[in-house]
Amino acid sequence: MVGGRYGLSSKDTTPGQIIAVYDNLEKDEPKNNFTIGINDDVTFTSLDYKEIELPHPGQISCKLWGLGGDGTVGANKNAISTIGFVGGKYAQAYFSYDTMKSGGLTQSHLRFGDEPILSTYLVSSADFVAVHAPTYVKKYDTTEDLKEGGTFLLNCPWTCLLYTSPSPRDRTR
């Protein structure tokens, strides 16, 4: 019998990590009491994994960065409901919050399309990324999860991206 833990420190479990579990089970001597989702540099029980991008033709995925209390999460809940109920699309939304309620980091992960959505993890490859707190472009890699050819929207008072160096200007056109 082999067992392990996941979801430690509220970390999301990704398809790449699940594949690592199955790869571990196929070994002659699989690692027991393993962990996925964190880098365990104390007991070294983490399984190595490679992130993969699962194709979902016709599905649109979005990741929106907000500031707790700015209305981003509420607006996204309304938007995904409208897309699903009024637009007749399959729709899914996950929301993650910082420990601070007001003023903390919020992330909205939205998916919608014409086929049922079976993804049970956060968006890590987005067609659309929006950032509603201009300071986030220096604090976080807000374009990390943007697909090649995806759309990046920065809600800011600036007229030029020169103020955001090095990110996201270096990854956008």
Question: At which residue positions do the language-model features occur?
Answer:
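Single conserved hydrophobic/aromatic residue that forms the stacking wall/gate
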Residues: 163-173
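Flexible inter-domain linker/hinge segments
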Residues: 8-61
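Phosphate/diphosphate-binding loops
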Residues: 1-29, 122-136, 142
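Anionic-ligand anchoring segments at beta-strand to alpha-helix junctions in alpha/beta enzyme folds, i.e.
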Residues: 61-125
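Fold-independent oxyanion-binding glycine-rich loops
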Residues: 3-5, 67, 113-115, 132-135, ...
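ADP-ribose/adenylate-binding Rossmann-like module
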Residues: 145-162
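Short glycine-rich, flexible loops that bind phosphorylated cofactors or substrates
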Residues: 137-139, 160-161
